[in-house]
Amino acid sequence: MTKRDLHNEGGDENKPRKKQKSEKQKKEKSAKSKSSAEQSLSYVQSPALGDVPQSEIEKFLTENSIKITDTSSENVMRPIISFSHLPPCKDDLYAPLSSFKSPTSIQSATWPLLFAGRDVIGIAETGSGKTLAFGLPCLKKIQDSAMTKQKPYRPLAVIISPTRELAMQIYDQLLKFSGSVGVRVACVFGGVRKEEQREALKTAGVVVATPGRLKDLQNDGSVDLGKVKYLVLDEADRMLDKGFEQDIKDIIRPMPVSKRQTIMFTATWPPSVRDLASTFMSSPVTVTIGGDPSADPRANTRIKQVVEVVKPHEKESRLVQLLNRSQRGVPEPEKVLAFCLYKKEAMRIERLLRTKGFKVAGIHGDLSQQERFRSLDAFKTGAATVLVATDVAARGLDIPSVKQVINVTFPLTVEDYVHRIGRTGRAGAEGHAVTLFTETDKAQSGALINVLRAAKQDIPEDLLKFGTTVKKKQHDAYGAFFKNVDTDKTATKIVFDD
């Protein structure tokens, strides 16, 4: 479906109709822009934030690598650098913030914009506090609008995430804040029965969902999205990678345009995500934390990266040696996340470590939803100190206090490598990542070397021997010959000579 079709289900049977639809879209976009401008007037900067010297604001933005791009306004809103700078709220919405020292970079930069009702694109690494960045303004918006009691099966806010685990994580975080404002939150995802989810949707003001299950519930009439005022697409790049673009378009189609605030969070900024943003968002403000998101992937500089070049048959014994060092003979065993490439490999490694006496749990595609939750819970509580995972756990999961990531097998792309090791070194902490690299991975050596150099990490001579050439990026289905094509562009007429 093209951008033109988003609010035009009737097709292009004739020219006048197409023109009429185009004019309607312009009116909708104009109404949306007007609505955003009016909403921005509702945010009043706190006097305490206004008293902060401009030099201190600029220093904060520079030190935290924050870039704010607003093409529709020359006046950039000041970041909320302290919880005391938050706008006034009813009840005890901010009470749970007492367990945090200060806002994260993404929260500081996006909160003023989101409280003002602007559409926002947030580009930041995982583990940066994105859930509260979009969650707090969402709950405050519902609270301020006195819409805590809405009609059955008609949520006011929808948050879409790529995985069940991430959806549950967002849900758990929102529950800590939603009770004080009387907003019910529902979480819907695949792999479990729909009956309980339908019951939860009846009274939910906020719905956290994976795209596949939400579309199913939407199609069978279990939820009406016609009153949604607040839409969040979390980890948009990951959802597109997983093939959810059409599902997302179908989900958004019935939502109002002029009164909807849309927020998109992503770790990368490829053309596919840019196209999605231009389709659903109106004059969004882009907030980037870190370097250029369209450039080569960069690892968190707080993570110490170690690459060991080994023979394939040496990987398992080396893994056991590394775990012996962090799990045995120490006052408190460290939490270690061990990544495998395929689920069969993960199952084999999990069995091996269990026979060696390690407290281990696993998370991969062959496990039921309940088994995956049990594994994650065991790892979070310390009942298991080693979690063996496939890349299903590589993005978005907030597992606190992970001291070390071990890549038993190198992933298919260096982007996945960066996301994997990003499970450690979160929330300002130091992290450690060990990668067991073999000759079968040599096609990725050049890209890996670039990541190591960018983070000023040591590069082993054995890795340099594989070469520094970076393999051309390929599309999953179309290989190296893939290129992005504007599907809205009129086709060129080709005439052949006789």
Curated annotation (Swiss-Prot):
Residues 318-467 form the Helicase C-terminal domain. A motif (Q motif) lies at residues 99-107. It holds the Pfam family Helicase_C. InterPro entries: DEAD/DEAH_box_helicase_dom, Helicase_ATP-bd, Helicase_C-like, P-loop_NTPase, RNA-helicase_DEAD-box_CS. GO terms for cellular component: nucleolus; preribosome, large subunit precursor. Residues 1-15, 22-31 have a biased composition (Basic and acidic residues). It is found in: Nucleus, Nucleolus. Residues 1-47 are annotated as: Disordered. Gene3D superfamilies: P-loop containing nucleotide triphosphate hydrolases. Its EC number is 3.6.4.13. It catalyses: ATP + H2O = ADP + phosphate + H(+). CDD domains: DEADc (cd00268), SF2_C_DEAD (cd18787). Disulfide bonds: none annotated. GO terms for biological process: endonucleolytic cleavage in ITS1 upstream of 5.8S rRNA from tricistronic rRNA transcript (SSU-rRNA, 5.8S rRNA, LSU-rRNA). ATP-dependent RNA helicase required for 60S ribosomal subunit synthesis. Involved in efficient pre-rRNA processing, predominantly at site A3, which is necessary for the normal formation of 25S and 5.8S rRNAs. The Q motif is unique to and characteristic of the DEAD box family of RNA helicases and controls ATP binding and hydrolysis. This is ATP-dependent RNA helicase dbp3.
